[in-house]
Amino acid sequence: ARKLKQLREAKGLSQRIVYIDTDFNIGKIEVGKTNITISTLSRLCNYYGTSLKEFFDELDQ
């Protein structure tokens, strides 16, 4: 959840814009109020311009 927030903020995007573009309630995802599937995570990574591999590699650091 924290990593997704970092990706969004690094792109200078508001939660509202991400919701409009993706139809995902990123606010609930970022605070851990909802679980997401790997498919949703993949779509969000694509939206933020990163890959699932990069996403998980950065978590390991």
What are the roles of these predicted feature ranges?
Residues K28-V31, S39, D57:
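Base-recognition residues in the alpha-helical recognition helix of bacterial helix-turn-helix
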Residues G12-K28:
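Short alpha-helical DNA-recognition segment
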Residues R8, Y19, C45:
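The alpha-helix within a helix-turn-helix
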Residues S39-E54:
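DNA major-groove recognition helix of helix-turn-helix/homeodomain DNA-binding modules
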Residues R2, I20, S42-R43:
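Surface-exposed alpha-helical interface segments used for non-catalytic interactions
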Residues A1-A10:
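A short, Lys/Arg-rich alpha-helix, primarily the initiator
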